């Protein structure tokens, strides 16, 4: 079943006339055309009969024509009201309620004479949750480039280098491999600075005998990777190394349990129980992982409350961590494809 037919099914389920998609990444997912419209209207209208209409600034029309999108294009000037160029009466419209602003909703009510709204967010999330072979290949390449980033960063480590200098070196060097954009702000944290799970790299200088935490990802043809490694620089304290070994055991055990039909919460429990049994449960303050694709964090989450089942074609992260203030912060993260038989680890830098 195609993406569009899934949306049409949801329109029928909710007795709606059309769906209005405005998140740029979701528009790209359905059309193959990517735009960052800023304050301008950029939206895909999917009607119950399968017709697709893309609203975009007139200056982008030629680019849309050159894209895979084959539906109707409504290009508008900044001085024009886009809705006046495509007059419609839509009784019930499905929207991305998590994204659409109140101001835009008011425009839809007046522009399309909308009487009521429904939600299409979950349907789109479920579609994006299962990756096609093409999407998997792009994520696999993004993961390969993330491995290269870690390699670049580790080779640059030396006493007195700052966290910020390592970040800059990684992001500048990886451009030589065709990377134009990272998935998120690269994180490099030294020693007990890594005890802050989302710490900000700064001017702290590297000293012998501490761990270095790398958390980074690369975007390849719109698809993200997201991986973490915690690397020894010298010989960290015995407690820090003990923490590392516990995190590695938790991650390895959770990954080995991955296969279709297993509840996501069970995977979280495996890692969390290992960490808790070793006395560090209070120092593991976040979920075990999350979905990965067009965004570095997307549906679904690998958490203790998610009863949904793993399915072949999902790509998730597994990233247990222990963060002890004044001692160390250790996190290890890999990107995992759920296969028909079990799993495939997409990130490979040594642990």
UniProtKB/Swiss-Prot annotation:
Coiled-coil portions: none
Record's keyword terms, sorted: Hydrolase, Manganese, Metal-binding
Organism: Staphylococcus aureus (strain MRSA252)
Signal peptide: none
Binding sites annotated in the UniProt record for Mn(2+) 2: 215, 226, 333
Gene3D superfamilies attached to this UniProt entry: Creatinase/methionine aminopeptidase superfamily, Creatinase/prolidase N-terminal domain
EC number of the protein: 3.4.-.-
Record's keyword annotation contains Metal-binding: yes
CDD domains listed in its UniProt record: APP-like (cd01092)
Entry's cofactor comment: Binds 2 manganese ions per subunit.
UniProt similarity note: Belongs to the peptidase M24B family.
Keyword Cell inner membrane among UniProt keywords: no
Cofactor(s), by name: Mn(2+)
Chain sites annotated for binding Mn(2+) 1: 226, 290, 319, 333
UniProt-recorded Gene Ontology molecular function terms: hydrolase activity; metal ion binding
Name by which UniProt lists this protein: Uncharacterized peptidase SAR1786
Pfam families: Creatinase_N, Peptidase_M24
